[in-house]
Amino acid sequence: MFPGARILATLTLALHLLHGTHAAIGPTGDMYIVNEDVSPDGFTRSAVVARSDPTTNGTSETLTGVLVQGNKGDNFQLNVLNQLSDTTMLKTTSIHWHGFFQSGSTWADGPAFVNQCPIASGNSFLYDFNVPDQAGTFWYHSHLSTQYCDGLRGPFIVYDPSDPHLSLYDVDNADTIITLEDWYHVVAPQNAVLPTADSTLINGKGRFAGGPTSALAVINVESNKRYRFRLISMSCDPNFTFSIDGHSLQVIEADAVNIVPIVVDSIQIFAGQRYSFVLNANQTVDNYWIRADPNLGSTGFDGGINSAILRYAGATEDDPTTTSSTSTPLEETNLVPLENPGAPGPAVPGGADININLAMAFDVTNFELTINGSPFKAPTAPVLLQILSGATTAASLLPSGSIYSLEANKVVEISIPALAVGGPHPFHLHGHTFDVIRSAGSTTYNFDTPARRDVVNTGTDANDNVTIRFVTDNPGPWFLHCHIDWHLEIGLAVVFAEDVTSITAPPAAWDDLCPIYDALSDSDKGGIA
């Protein structure tokens, strides 16, 4: 980046920090992983949270982790310090920076037992990676078992001073981030195998059915300003139907990919997905309900559940009395990439260099979810360590049946027929975005202007056969998994071992993670009832 552009980028980030009210770190900084008593919905419990400060003062009324932010072109150096002590939850950890390609830094991607061993309590690990050509809305979360369901998740924004949509909005800062989370009153290691959330949190706050009238998140706007809201589903399970009473949403980004603007009034968002939309605050000064209705658990909005408040400057500090009326939902097939649209390879189904069908199934006997007959079971040695130790083929890599070798510079087509059990399943591919040449609910293949993203809903209908394409231009072991964390825990994942002979060596500190972790006792690892 030339000096003038670097100065502009620094000023841009400074303005975002100045106008935002939330604590933030980035592109360098310390992230403390701590246990903290939280009461985001009026129920108090211990949680695993990410903070910019290791000290805790009483019970926190919000859950969402520290915001990480920077600019396109930045080098991120995020030092994760594990200070976990509560043995009822996992005490080790690893962090995945969701949506980043990690080109040349697959060791920093974060999934435990795929790209690294977990970080032991009392230890730290520096995630050092470059973001040369990505900008948009990302997030981070634990990628160890179901730990992020206990709270370890937060937003990650990369701003682009040359954003092609810059003329469409006036405000884009920390206060225009909207996070959606499902929250559980029982810690994950002691919860049911497939639990139902107790509440929905919007920006870390919410209410549960039958619970107290706890404070809801309030998002403040001024009349006649245009706001870029960044909507992030940090869900462990449910998808949400999101809307804001009385307002249309001009969608301009999906999963950190700029799109041709499209106006809707509701968005169905699945675990791991992100959207940016522009809201024009051109309605009567008042309070308006923000709604995020989950597909599971306590649905609806009685008593303010699944809700937050959009408040115009000058409005009273009361709950809204508005009603919902939506008729134009977002359709994935209408998401057209702004830059370089079009899927790689011949415009015919099955015409890629490598074509793989991934058939999901539910093994009732073993209570496992499988892909092509195999449940993913975390190996004792991370897949990356196995590769660096000389294992380079699917046959020699563990877990057996869950590794797929991919040659360099090939067009890959993945088809994922729907599984109704536990569906719809949102699948996330690490290390890449992909083109969705066939979406859920559609029988049409679109090679010219397919949606481009990194999490795709695979549908529930027997006729659904979601199909994606990408190019193997990024060496590494890359996870492909259901982003319903409870489903990943019982096997719904595979690993693509991509161009393994070109993988670069990790730093020395990475080499120390496994010996330290392997020496831990069960008590040191946590998750004990």
From Swiss-Prot:
Cu cation 3 binds at residues 143, 430, 481. Its EC number is 1.10.3.2. Its cofactor is Cu cation. Keywords: Copper, Disulfide bond, Glycoprotein, Lignin degradation, Metal-binding, Oxidoreductase, Repeat, Secreted, Signal. Disulfide bonds join 117-514, 149-236. Residues 1-23 form the signal peptide. It is an enzyme of class 1 (oxidoreductase). Cu cation 2 binds at residues 98, 141, 483. PROSITE patterns: MULTICOPPER_OXIDASE1, MULTICOPPER_OXIDASE2. Pfam families: Cu-oxidase, Cu-oxidase_2, Cu-oxidase_3. Residues 25-159, 170-312, 380-499 form the Plastocyanin-like domain. Binds 4 Cu cations per monomer. It catalyses: 4 hydroquinone + O2 = 4 benzosemiquinone + 2 H2O. It is found in: Secreted. Cu cation 1 binds at residues 96, 428. InterPro entries: Cu-oxidase-like_N (IPR011707), Cu-oxidase_2nd (IPR001117), Cu-oxidase_C (IPR011706), Cu-oxidase_fam (IPR045087), Cu_oxidase_CS (IPR033138), Cu_oxidase_Cu_BS (IPR002355), Cupredoxin (IPR008972). GO terms for molecular function: copper ion binding; hydroquinone:oxygen oxidoreductase activity. Its main location: secreted. This is Laccase-1. It comes from Pleurotus ostreatus (Oyster mushroom).
